[in-house]
Amino acid sequence: MVSFSSLLLACSAVTAFAAPSDQSIAERSLSERSTPSSTGTSGGYYYSFWTDGGGDVTYTNGDGGSYTVEWTNVGNFVGGKGWNPGSSQTISYSGSFNPSGNGYLSVYGWTQNPLIEYYIVESYGDYNPGTAGTHQGTLESDGSTYDIYTATRENAPSIEGTATFTQFWSVRQSKRTSGSVTTQNHFDAWSQLGMTLGTHNYQIVAVEGYQSSGSASITVS
């Protein structure tokens, strides 16, 4: 999910330059502390970090497949480590995930032709992200039941720029912050429900925050 914030600065009609307000200084300082959006490689893994610029979020790559993220009063961000391109592999991860409000820990990725954004949600905060979509069915995998949903995003940010696209969701009923995800099971279940993926782009174990605060430390393998 993506939200955007706007900033309106009032100017005084005087001949001398007005001193910046305490609010504008604080907002500029907050922006300077936050990690900018970026992609690349770190520790032998692909990483992706995206933020809409709202609030304070610090994403830090560690050794190997590890990373940390701390966020305060954010708009929306998503970041993590994995692979580019993704595949129908089994992904192991471990760590801590402590959202205060709305946040997700998931296997997260994109495909093209068709353009699909997908989530295999392992844990979430106080909001189940799948419930905003349409429930399609369930899947038994990796020791739990996953509820499967679809949703449509219109004129939203994507790997192809602003676009309209479909989201696929598998949301684990028993939350966890470590384990293995057999992605093939999800891809097969989606296909059986008529949910067709395209050609894999990147695939990461991601932390996402939306209008919330929190912290996480994750290692991917």
From Swiss-Prot:
Top EC class, one word: hydrolase
Active site, renumbered: 117 (nucleophile), 208 (proton donor)
GO biological process, one term: xylan catabolic process
The protein's Enzyme Commission number: 3.2.1.8
Keywords per UniProt: Carbohydrate metabolism, Glycosidase, Hydrolase, Polysaccharide degradation, Secreted, Signal, Xylan degradation
Keyword Metal-binding: no
PROSITE patterns found in the cross-reference section: GH11_1, GH11_2, GH11_3
Catalytic activity field: Endohydrolysis of (1->4)-beta-D-xylosidic linkages in xylans
InterPro entries, sorted: ConA-like_dom_sf (IPR013320), GH11/12 (IPR013319), GH11_AS_1 (IPR018208), GH11_AS_2 (IPR033119), GH11_dom (IPR033123), Glyco_hydro_11 (IPR001137)
Residue ranges constituting the GH11 domain according to the UniProt record: 33-221
Gene3D superfamilies (UniProt xref): 2.60.120.180
Induction or repression: Expressed in the presence of D-xylose under conditions of acidic ambient pH, probably under the regulation of the pacC transcription factor. Repressed in presence of glucose through the action of the creA transcription repressor.
Signal sequence region: 1-18
Location in the cell: Secreted
One Gene Ontology molecular-function label: endo-1,4-beta-xylanase activity
Keyword ATP-binding: no
Job description of the protein: Endo-1,4-beta-xylanase involved in the hydrolysis of xylan, a major structural heterogeneous polysaccharide found in plant biomass representing the second most abundant polysaccharide in the biosphere, after cellulose.
Protein family: Belongs to the glycosyl hydrolase 11 (cellulase G) family.
PANTHER family referenced in this protein's UniProt entry, alphabetically: ENDO-1,4-BETA-XYLANASE A-RELATED
Protein's name in the database: Endo-1,4-beta-xylanase B
Gene encoding the protein: xlnB
